[in-house]
From Swiss-Prot:
Species annotation: Helicobacter pylori (strain ATCC 700392 / 26695) (Campylobacter pylori)
Annotated region described as Cytidylyltransferase, given as residue ranges: 332-461
Keyword Nucleotide-binding on entry: yes
Pathway, per record: Nucleotide-sugar biosynthesis; ADP-L-glycero-beta-D-manno-heptose biosynthesis; ADP-L-glycero-beta-D-manno-heptose from D-glycero-beta-D-manno-heptose 7-phosphate: step 1/4; Nucleotide-sugar biosynthesis; ADP-L-glycero-beta-D-manno-heptose biosynthesis; ADP-L-glycero-beta-D-manno-heptose from D-glycero-beta-D-manno-heptose 7-phosphate: step 3/4; Bacterial outer membrane biogenesis; LPS core biosynthesis
Protein name as it appears in the record: Bifunctional protein HldE
Length: 461
């Protein structure tokens, strides 16, 4: 279990839910008939709550007021299993409270109660002391800045310096226009509007997006520059090139707290040694879960897995496939199927004609790299699996990580194992577990290698 320290502005989110069907006689404003009320952890506490939902151990550091809202807030943190030992009481301010008024599941108003003054020197020292005490114990840090007075320039830079000194990952969710405040952070997560305001640059093209991210890297020394683009996903730099991770969300009901979900899921993904691209895909999936709910919602690992795996109903794990099959004549074949072409489709159609259920074992990306070198595959396993599953002749697709499909064949025990005719007089792996092995002729003139060579020639001309 990863240990993550979250520091930032703590916000109590309060919701009034109801219906509004008339205007007030006192003024031209809607009247809400309240049907229920709810309270959520907001701001940095919502980041912490998201991390708890993703099975992390969380230490939260910030301030609340000396009031009833502050007491309830700390109680709610403890109830969620969040370590609240870093929460300080500021007698000079109220607990930040945002009240959202929801009618027919639409937000019609918000009322904010807050004090944005910077913390006094004593509180700032106590926060930094807590940070210093915990830094060796934790795996990563998130600075959640809502511009409410906790993370001023000096404190932010001191925490980033300490994190770097101890070789800890530190991510910042920025606010304001001065990004030098976050310089030397591992990663920051501005949205498009925030980054445009900070850099005075319109992000209306790939060129400007790339330029903005280069500025973050070269001017502010952000190790992994990134920008969130709402419905267009997340953009980042990889070896100096702009990469876009498209969004996954199908329906958007409420974007409240989506940024908190993104930074929480990015942090955990990177701490689990995911690549930045994979971490962005994971964060997009987590965001897709929460924007499909009302209020500052949470995404569980199970919900994220469902989103990531909802590529095609025919793409199953071996375990799920074995549960599905029922006394039918099973045909099995396997391959890389990189750059799917007519020859592949013809081969699979002929294989399907031999029985009832055609199962295709698909080499994973890692498997292909071992077999064919680092430049392959051209098409990712997720996309290759989706294309195969889209063929009417294919009933199920199972991705395997090994160099050969022997484990799949042994588990499935197919009626017919289909391989290409080029296996004539060669050993067919797994044939001992099939009732029959059938060698199928390929359609002449079609191969992935030929397509790659044609593309190379075209590019060179």
């Amino acid at each position: 279990m990863k240990k993550i320290l979250v520091i930032g502005d703590l916000i109590a989110d309060y919701y009034l839910w109801g219906k509004s069907e008339r205007l007030s006689p006192e003024a031209p404003v809607p009247v809400l008939e309240v049907q229920r009320e709810s309270k959520n952890l907001g701001g940095a506490a919502n980041v912490a709550n998201n991390l708890i939902s993703l099975k992390a151990k969380v230490f939260l550091c910030g301030v609340v007021g000396d009031d009833l809202e502050g007491e309830h807030f700390i109680s709610a943190l403890k109830a969620r299993g969040i370590d609240a030992s870093g929460i300080l009481i500021d007698k000079t301010r109220c607990t930040t409270l945002k009240t959202r008024i929801i009618a027919q599941n639409q937000q019609i108003a918000r009322v904010d109660k807050e004090i944005k003054d910077p913390l006094n020197a004593d509180l700032r020292k106590k926060l930094l002391d807590f940070f210093t005490e915990k830094i060796q114990e934790i795996d990563g840090v998130i600075l959640s800045d809502y511009n409410k007075g906790v993370l001023d320039f000096e404190l932010t830079q001191a925490m980033i310096a300490l994190a770097n000194q101890h070789h800890k990952l530190i991510l910042c969710d920025p606010k304001g226009k001065d990004y030098s405040k976050y310089s030397h952070a591992s990663l920051i997560t501005p949205n498009r509007t925030e980054l445009e305001h900070a850099l005075h640059l319109k992000l209306d093209s790939h060129a400007n997006l790339s330029k903005a991210l280069q500025i973050l890297k070269e001017t502010y020394h952000i190790a992994m520059p990134l920008v969130t683009l709402s419905e267009q996903g997340i953009a980042f730099l990889e070896k100096g090139e702009l990469v876009n991770c498209p969004t996954i969300a199908k329906e958007v009901y409420d974007v409240t707290g989506a940024g908190d979900t993104v930074i929480a899921s990015l942090t955990l993904s990177l701490l689990e040694s995911m690549s930045l691209k994979d971490a962005c895909e994971f964060a997009n999936a987590a965001a897709a879960v929460v924007v499909g709910k009302m209020g500052s919602a949470l995404a569980s690992l199970e919900e994220i897995a469902l989103i990531l795996n909802q590529t095609h109903p025919k793409i199953l794990s071996l375990e799920k496939l074995l549960e599905t099959l029922d006394q039918q004549k099973i045909i099995f074949t396997n391959g890389c199927f990189d750059l799917l072409h007519k020859g592949h489709a013809s081969y699979l159609q002929k294989a399907k004609a031999l029985g009832d259920i055609l199962i295709v074992g698909l080499n994973s990306d890692a498997s292909i790299k071992r077999l064919k070198g680092d430049k392959r595959p051209i098409v990712s396993e997720k996309d290759r699996a989706f294309l195969l599953a889209s063929l009417s002749c294919v009933d199920y697709v199972v991705v395997f990580e090994e160099d050969t499909p022997i484990k799949l064949i042994q588990a499935l025990k197919p009626d017919i194992l289909v391989k290409g005719a080029d296996y004539l007089n060669k050993e067919v792996i797994g044939s001992e577990f099939a009732k029959e092995t059938h060698l199928m002729e390929f359609e002449e003139g079609y191969s992935t290698s030929a397509i790659i060579e044609k593309i190379k020639r075209t590019c060179n001309d």
